Amino acid sequence: RSEAGDRLPSERDLADRLGVTRNTIREALSVLESMRVIERRPNSGVYVKDIRMESSVDLLVLQADLGLPGTADDNFQAMEVRSLLEVQAIRLACRRRSDSDLEKMRQILQLAESQIAKGQPINEEDEAFHMAIAAATKNAVLRRVLTVFYLMYRSRRMVYFSDKERSQRSQSHHRKMYEAIEARD
């Protein structure tokens, strides 16, 4: 296991240890470098960076996809950022939404109601509703950033929404958000 600041073994060494070609190692290192997990230092080698300070949001998604737990502090901070962004998304959607944006949200709310009535979780509808709000902002950057949060927490939301009460509570919040956006309030 490597820690921040550690020098990685040579490409040849890594290839031998992992039973792959050097080309495969080079490709993997390029991906890790683009995600800011490692840095190449000329005439020195490849070093592990402090990912808590320098990694890209892509790494957060990868970490979630691989089922690697973040720290409680990481999770709290991610939810804090998501909450800030979603509040701003609702404000922008109130000003910029179109009738077709409202129709999309209305359809998602109806689908979620149907899922709840059947005792099914609404994790997909939850994501779709929030992404419909993001689309209504007409801000492509905000939409992409919010997408990262939904990718990060996809598996957690499946568990969260397996509880019918949570689904109902979430649906109630969604209705209030929809009404505020509809009223431009």
Question: Which positions does each model-derived feature cover?
Answer:
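Conserved amphipathic alpha-helical segments that form helical-bundle/coiled-coil interaction surfaces
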Residues: 78-159, 169-180
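Structural signature of alpha-solenoid helical repeat scaffolds
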Residues: 162-165
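Short, intrinsically disordered, charge-balanced linker/junction segments flanking boundaries
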Residues: 1, 177-185
